[in-house]
């Protein structure tokens, strides 16, 4: 670089703890770019994609989606983990760890894109910055297991040991001191999870196992929600007006997700 040479470095590959060459998984080139920018102490890392930047939602799904000029690391992490595919989650985590601003730009046309950085001007933030969705999950329910301390661990431990990642979890209490336990996993893991639950149900004296792979998870994200009440209520009312039933809900300080 000091000699004016522009190096072209391949992304998507790295080295594990044993020194073996390996790949970084989906979106690994983003992570490569961020790691190099951190090592070179760059002012920002620019990620060129097939979109103009980060939108309020997927513009291919909603023609009213708006380009965001700026979004915080925290919001981008929530959006990426909830289905937004514009930036790879690990790349955002790494940039946040070293406070390296990211700029998402289009490869096909000029523009300022979207700047992802530490939160600034919180008073000017919109309540909701973005909406993301995932339709690649399945919902599994184990019926009639005893409602006793530790039952959740007994259900989820074998799932975790099988390397299956669980997303949304809901536990319901019934009148006979039994509970229905529901959670979501990636569709590719649904059959394996179902087989594990069948064995768990027999061990716990539970009932039937139900699998539903025709679901979607919708999330709204925004740091402004911390200071504003009623966001969840408005979201639920909007879904109800459109006759969309909610089967699961999960929330954090800046994110509300529903499974429909």
Residue ranges and their predicted role:
Residues 1-260:
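C-terminal catalytic "cap/lid" subdomain
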């Amino acid at each position: 670089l000091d000699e004016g040479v522009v190096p072209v470095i391949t992304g998507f590959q790295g080295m594990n703890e044993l020194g073996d060459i390996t790949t970084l998984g989906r979106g690994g080139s983003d992570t490569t770019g961020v790691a190099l920018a951190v090592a070179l102490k760059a002012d920002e890392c620019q990620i060129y994609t097939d979109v103009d930047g980060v939108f309020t939602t997927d513009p291919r799904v909603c023609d009213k989606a708006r380009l965001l000029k700026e979004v915080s690391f925290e919001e981008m992490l929530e959006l990426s983990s909830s289905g937004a595919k514009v930036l790879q989650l690990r790349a955002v985590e790494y940039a946040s760890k070293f406070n390296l601003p990211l700029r998402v730009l289009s490869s096909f046309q000029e523009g300022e894109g979207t700047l992802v950085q530490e939160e600034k001007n919180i008073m000017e933030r919109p309540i909701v910055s973005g909406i993301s969705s995932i339709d690649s999950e399945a919902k599994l329910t184990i019926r009639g297991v005893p409602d006793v301390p530790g039952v959740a661990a007994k259900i989820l431990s074998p799932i975790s040991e099988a390397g299956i990642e669980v997303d949304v979890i809901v536990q319901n209490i019934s009148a006979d001191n039994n509970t229905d336990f529901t959670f979501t996993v990636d569709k590719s893991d649904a059959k394996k999870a179902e087989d594990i639950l069948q064995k768990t149900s027999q061990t716990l004296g539970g009932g039937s196992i139900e699998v539903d792979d025709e679901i979607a998870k919708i999330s709204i994200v925004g740091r402004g929600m911390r200071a504003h009440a009623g966001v969840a209520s408005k979201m639920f009312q909007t879904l109800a007006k459109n006759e969309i039933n909610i089967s699961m809900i999960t929330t954090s300080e800046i994110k509300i997700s529903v499974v429909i």
